[in-house]
């Protein structure tokens, strides 16, 4: 089985890459602990998951090469969904958002490496300022890939990631969107908005966590034959 290298950008939790690491693939999670979401509490640790604390900007690929980080076979990215214009002003009439620029950069990097790629972002203005998403999903729709005994990050977080949060996926390079397999739970709302108040880094982290069933489904659909 050929081992792959996975890059997961704007990823402080390590959730997306963990299934790959568990099957022997090497994962690099890039995230700036001084960024909007801070350093993630309870991030996923594994000998093959490498958390790299760095900012992701226009010379990101060159910096990775200088650090001798292997070229990726697949890239995942979760750009901050805060609608901030490139100018630094709150989004209103601006047409260039940081999240859109980051998403475009991910596509360019992936195409340069000939890698599969996927950008995930909640429903928002990225669709209007970049392009229509390739796919949509809610976390509960991939709950069937979970066993139900996974760690709960919060007392209000339902088992099987059984909640709604309409999420957009932009993808290319041969990325395969996995088949949906809903779990037995769907509370019909996003617990992170209903029960988490304030604007602390921990609240932002909990609201932005990658659904674990989706992460596993993506691995199964994109790992390649006989793996």
Question: Model-predicted segments: where are they?
Answer:
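Enriched but not universal
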Residues: 1, 14, 226-227
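Extreme N-terminal starter segment of soluble prokaryotic enzymes
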Residues: 2-6
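Class I SAM-dependent methyltransferase "Motif I" SAM/SAH-binding loop
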Residues: 8-14
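Class I S-adenosyl-L-methionine
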Residues: 9, 31, 63-74, 81-226
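Flexible, glycine-rich phosphate/dinucleotide-binding loops
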Residues: 15, 36, 143
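Rossmann-fold NAD(P)-dependent oxidoreductase module
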Residues: 19
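Adenosine-cofactor binding site in Rossmann-like domains, unifying the SAM/SAH pocket
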Residues: 22-67, 134-135
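Extended cationic-aromatic binding surfaces that line active-site or macromolecule-binding grooves
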Residues: 55, 59, 73, 79
């Amino acid at each position: 089985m050929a081992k792959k290298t996975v890059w997961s950008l704007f990823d402080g939790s390590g959730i997306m890459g963990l299934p790959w690491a568990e099957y022997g693939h090497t994962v690099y999670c890039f995230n700036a602990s001084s960024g909007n979401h801070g350093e993630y509490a309870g991030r996923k640790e594994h000998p093959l998951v490498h958390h790299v604390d760095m900012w992701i900007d226009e010379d990101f690929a060159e910096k990775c090469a200088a650090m001798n980080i292997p070229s990726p076979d697949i890239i995942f990215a979760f750009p901050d969904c805060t609608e901030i214009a490139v100018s630094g002003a709150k989004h209103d009439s601006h047409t260039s958002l940081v999240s859109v620029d980051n998403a475009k950069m991910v596509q360019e990097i992936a195409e340069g490496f000939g890698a599969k790629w996927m950008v995930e972002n909640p429903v928002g203005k990225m669709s209007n300022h970049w392009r229509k998403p390739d796919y949509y999903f809610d976390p509960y729709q991939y709950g069937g890939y979970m066993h139900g005994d996974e760690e709960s990050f919060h007392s209000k977080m339902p088992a099987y990631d059984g909640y709604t949060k309409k999420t957009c996926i932009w993808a290319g390079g041969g990325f395969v969107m996995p088949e949906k397999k809903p779990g037995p739970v769907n509370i019909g709302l996003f617990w992170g908005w209903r029960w988490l108040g304030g604007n602390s880094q921990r609240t932002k982290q909990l609201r932005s966590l990658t659904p674990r069933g989706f992460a596993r489904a993506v691995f199964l659909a994109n790992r390649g034959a006989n793996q």
